[in-house]
Amino acid sequence: MLKDTFTLWNLNNPWRLGAVVAYYAVLSLPGFLIVVINSVGAFWGREIVQGEITQQISEAIGPDAAKSVVEIIENSRNSDKNLFATIIGIIVLVFGATGVFYQLQISMNEIWSVKVDPKAGIWKVIKDRALSLAFVMVIAFLLIVSFIASTALTVLSGFLSRLWEPALVYLAQIFEFGLSTAVLGLLFVLIFRFMPDMKIQWSSVWLGGFMTSIMFNLGKILLSFYFGAANPNSAYGAAGSVVLILLWVSYSCLILFFGAAFTRIYTEKYEVEIHPQDFAMKVEIEEVVVEKGCDNPPEEEEKK
């Protein structure tokens, strides 16, 4: 099954899909961060949330990228606007925050070989944007849960360290890794369930979602080591932080798309037959070779 998963994953050119999502992730970053920080900050405190996000980014891709993200947040907040400009700004902010999920949905549809019916019209676009906004809010909710749990675990680790029980401290760290895997797994389950325009059952997405979560957490650790040792942003000067964000999102998408391919293979092998949504259609892409080079024997046509 892993062989079939890799074949499907590679067939859909995940590097291209990851690059597209990474590009839109950078464009969506200001709106996404402001929406999440304001949403979670209403319960937890904006400065605390911003500090936690900055710390996570610093651990994942380095302090330079984290500093750039802080500047993006501050610049988005400090712009002086009148009432009309503020309303337009909010609309643009929400539209920008949902852009990366909209592109992610398009990529998921490619992996599932499904396409939106052109007759679906504007209501399909509105529905997709609403779904993307819902995912932003889901992430905000999961961040609240994660912050509460992380705070509790930090207090617990400090208490255990004072007892001079290193094994218990390591146990708390393992539990924190498991908690992170569970939270991310739930997010990936929701992505695999609702993002593709397919009628997918809940039973089809649990294994793929949590497998992707484990790979994502392990990949995050490996990427942090790579970024720390190789320092790939040094060759790009002032644009280095943006390049790091692009690389991190692109590499993360490779894992996400592998999980999506696994979910499709698993569903087609073990679950009931699934069908596209009412506004979508299943597609098959066929390559037709109409001409070969001179070194190849002449053939009229070859289909793959």
What name fits each language-model region?
Residues M1-K304:
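Membrane-embedded alpha-helices and immediately adjacent juxtamembrane helical segments
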